[in-house]
A protein has these predicted regions:
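Conserved ABC ATPase "signature" C-loop
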Residues: 241-242
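A short, proline-enriched helix->beta-strand linker immediately N-terminal to the Walker B motif
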Residues: 181-185
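Conserved ABC ATPase signature
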Residues: 162-166, 170
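Conserved ABC ATPase "signature" region
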Residues: 25-34, 91-92, 133, 140-157
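ABC ATPase "signature
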Residues: 247-248, 256, 328
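Conserved ABC transporter NBD signature motif
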Residues: 84-92
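The conserved cystathionine-beta-synthase
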Residues: 290-313, 317-322, 327-340
């Protein structure tokens, strides 16, 4: 049974001299553009409701100005909301006083930024252990913990190097190691890989997924890259002009877009690379499978599409990890999915 780790309810953020007044205008139907031109206020977020599951990667995506970075900064109250409620493990984050909020930021959450945010005068190991030093850990213990995570992200031998000696990808590994060293349950990643070259970005995505399979953190990941979102997200929330357009499983974002905006967002995606057999299979219900070929439920369509073209089977049987038949895909359905 899934557990809600972070719950966001009716969240509004209006930037300006009188945000409460601005919010009333928004509730009365004033749009983002009119709010800016007529009332000189900026609509950051409008009535956001989102449940983020424990031990999952929740992707929040949208174009520039959609509100995604504003939203993630509300979780640890780097930005205060105009209205709404945020609870973490059933605790009201809005009710925290300064000390409680400070402890929450130190112990429960960690952030990884797009621009790395490393201390240029500190070595790699000092950057990674910075949070532990601020919490009062003994130097030996802080160094031991930091060394463990430096190894985990593949930076052995770079402990005494300075940030300027590292490539962008290596600097972001330092940022990730620093976040993980604090052993926080919640990892907030704001466009963490967006500034990296494509190959380095792919490496970082793989590192994150590998670590997540071991650590099972609750990760909130901001991106404007749909391919990245589909690769790493357990769920994807798409924002437009500060409003939530759709929050769904990656396969459902692709197969069942709920708005024209989401439909346009996903129209150029190579479905064979991101959809697995289990995403498109149907129940067997006594179907004759004697002439079917077999694929694993976690196989991407791309993996078996050539075989389909060559063998032209009437049906594809989908099996789980125990080789049990769990569903089927007809050639017609596969063709329809790839043509959408």
């Amino acid at each position: 049974m899934s557990v809600v780790k972070i719950k966001i309810e009716s969240l509004y953020k209006i930037f300006g001299t009188n945000p409460k007044m601005g919010m009333e205008h928004v509730k009365n139907g004033v749009g983002k553009d009119e709010l800016l031109t007529k009332y000189s206020h900026v609509l950051g977020l409008q009535d956001i409701n989102l449940n983020i599951q424990e031990k999952s990667i929740q992707v929040i995506m949208g174009l520039s100005g959609s509100g995604k970075s504003t939203l993630i900064r509300h979780i640890n109250r780097l930005i205060e909301p105009t209205a709404g409620k945020i609870t973490v493990e059933d605790q009201d984050v809005m009710a925290y006083d300064k000390n409680a909020l400070r402890n929450f930021r130190r112990q429960k959450t960690a952030m990884v930024f797009q621009r790395f945010a490393l201390m240029p005068h500190m070595t790699v190991i000092k950057n990674v252990s910075l949070g532990l030093d601020m919490q009062g850990f003994k130097p030996e213990e802080a160094k031991e913990k930091a060394s463990k995570w430096i190894e985990k992200v593949g930076l052995n031998g770079y402990e005494e190097k300075y940030p300027q000696h590292l490539s962008g990808g290596m600097q972001q590994r330092v940022g990730l190691a620093r976040a993980l060293t604090n052993d926080a349950d919640i990892l907030l990643m704001d466009e963490a890989f967006s500034a990296l070259d494509p190959l380095i970005r792919k490496d970082m995505q793989d590192i994150l997924l590998g670590l997540q399979s071991e650590l099972h953190k609750t990760v909130v990941f901001i991106t404007h890259d749909l391919d990245e979102a589909l690769k790493i997200g357990d769920r994807i929330a798409i924002l437009k002009d500060g409003k939530m357009d759709q929050d769904d499983l990656p396969a459902d974002i692709l197969l069942n877009p709920k708005t024209d905006y989401v439909k346009k967002f996903v129209e150029d995606v190579n479905r064979s690379r991101v959809l697995k057999a289990k995403h498109i299979m149907q129940k067997l219900n006594g179907k004759d499978i004697s002439k079917a070929i077999k694929v694993n439920e976690d196989d991407f369509i791309e993996k078996f599409i050539d075989r389909i073209v060559e063998e032209k089977p009437e049906m594809i049987v989908v099996q789980d990890k125990q080789n049990k038949n769990v569903g089927y895909i007809s050639s017609k359905r596969l063709s329809e999915i790839l043509k959408k």
